[in-house]
């Protein structure tokens, strides 16, 4: 208990609260786009009555969804029979098989025209998980304050001292990941509802949102949001353990911080400077930011080949 109180000091708690509030402010600012709240509300009321373009676009999407699914399946069947893709040991053939199998699950699902603005806005905003990850790195940095004095020698040299400390800290990281993700996500979700109004039926298919046209799991919006939250916890916790291991391995916190900064810089360079068609460019789909945010990877269909076995990535 003392270790938890030491790690989650008043300063850390205040920092987390401030970061979450700033995240809400940034999200709200992005939605308002320079307008006042009154102007934004007026625009939303008018758009509900006059936005024929968006209504027509959504109607066309809903009417054409099952045809789109059927076309993907038919195209996969046609490509499978072509000589160029006939080798059953190659990635291209197995990719076609997996794609056909995944889209087959979506045949015949019924979509409905709904107001999903708040949910769509919430899912498109991907900074929340990044803020949570940065806070977790700061918390881990704070964990190793004993490196600045000789206390760590006494703890590490005592019987089972290092093991107990490690287990307590891993537990603390998990609890922190769970709470921070929940508070940060629920705050943005509530803000989206305040701005755009209540969501339509959360039990209808997530494919009602156009961004999920290629999402091949027939689940509800509520189930998807729950799945997204679980994935965010898993990803943030896993990355936090890697950061924790790096801090534990290096003697100085500054060294670990510099290594993390270097990795993030290389990732940024790869993401922004790699040319299309290159092998490195393929890493864009699985860069750190996309992995942390999860939604950009979850909401699309893509396959991976691991030891010759082709499967859907998630």
Give the positions of each predicted feature.
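Secretory targeting signals
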Residues: 23-53, 57, 72, 95-146, ...
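Alpha-helical transmembrane segments and their immediate interhelical loop/hinge regions
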Residues: 151, 162, 166-167
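Membrane topogenic helices and adjacent juxtamembrane segments
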Residues: 62, 68-106
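Short helix-to-coil transition segments within interhelical loops
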Residues: 156-162
């Amino acid at each position: 208990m003392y270790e938890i109180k030491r790690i989650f000091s008043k300063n850390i708690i205040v920092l987390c609260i401030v970061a979450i509030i700033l995240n809400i402010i940034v999200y709200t600012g992005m939605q308002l786009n320079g307008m006042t709240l009154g102007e934004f509300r007026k625009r939303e009321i008018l758009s509900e009555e006059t936005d024929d373009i968006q209504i027509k676009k959504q109607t066309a999407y809903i009417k054409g969804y099952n045809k789109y699914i059927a076309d993907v399946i038919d195209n996969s069947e046609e490509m499978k029979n072509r000589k160029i893709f006939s080798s059953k040991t190659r990635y291209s053939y197995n990719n076609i098989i997996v794609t056909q199998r995944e889209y087959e699950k979506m045949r015949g699902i019924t979509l409905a025209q709904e107001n999903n603005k708040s949910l769509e806005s919430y899912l498109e905003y991907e900074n929340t998980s990044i803020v949570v990850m940065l806070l977790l790195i700061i918390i881990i940095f704070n964990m190793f304050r004993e490196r600045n004095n000789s206390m760590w020698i006494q703890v590490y040299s005592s019987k089972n001292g290092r093991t107990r400390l490690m287990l307590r800290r891993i537990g603390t990281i998990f609890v922190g990941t769970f709470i921070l993700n929940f508070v940060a996500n629920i705050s943005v979700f509530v803000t989206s509802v305040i701005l755009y109004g209540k969501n339509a039926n959360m039990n209808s298919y997530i494919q009602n949102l156009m961004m999920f046209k290629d999402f091949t799991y027939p689940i509800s919006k509520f189930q998807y949001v729950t799945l997204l939250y679980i994935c965010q916890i898993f990803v943030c916790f896993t990355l936090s353990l890697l950061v924790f291991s790096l801090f534990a391995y290096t003697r100085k916190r500054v060294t670990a911080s510099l290594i993390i900064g270097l990795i993030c810089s290389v990732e940024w360079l790869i993401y922004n400077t790699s040319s299309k068609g290159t092998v490195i460019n393929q890493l864009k789909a699985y860069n750190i930011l996309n992995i942390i945010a999860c939604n950009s990877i979850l909401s699309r269909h893509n396959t991976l080949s691991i030891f010759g076995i082709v499967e859907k990535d998630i």
